[in-house]
Amino acid sequence: GEIYLSGEDVCKLLHISKRTLQQYRDDKILPYIQIGGKIIYKESDILTILEQNYISNNTHHI
């Protein structure tokens, strides 16, 4: 099944502050689920965003 993360979990995973996490929500960078006053994140969404922003430094010099 799907794994859901708290904001605190996401901050630790991404090494960001709660304010930065709020900014990511405001800028629609991270999708989230709001149930009542609680906000949670799908782990798969976080991993997808990390993959989409992966920058490889594998450059080949001739």
Residue ranges and their predicted role:
Residues 3, 28, 39:
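Flexible coil/turn residues that form the inter-helical turn or adjacent wing/linker of helix-turn-helix
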Residues 27-33:
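Short, solvent-exposed alpha-helical "recognition" segments
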Residues 33-39:
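Short Lys/Arg-enriched helix C-cap and helix-to-coil transition segments
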Residues 1, 33, 58-59:
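Short, hydrophobic secondary-structure boundary micro-motifs
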Residues 46-62:
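A short, Lys/Arg-enriched interface patch at domain edges and termini
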Residues 1-19, 23, 52:
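Polyanion-binding surface elements
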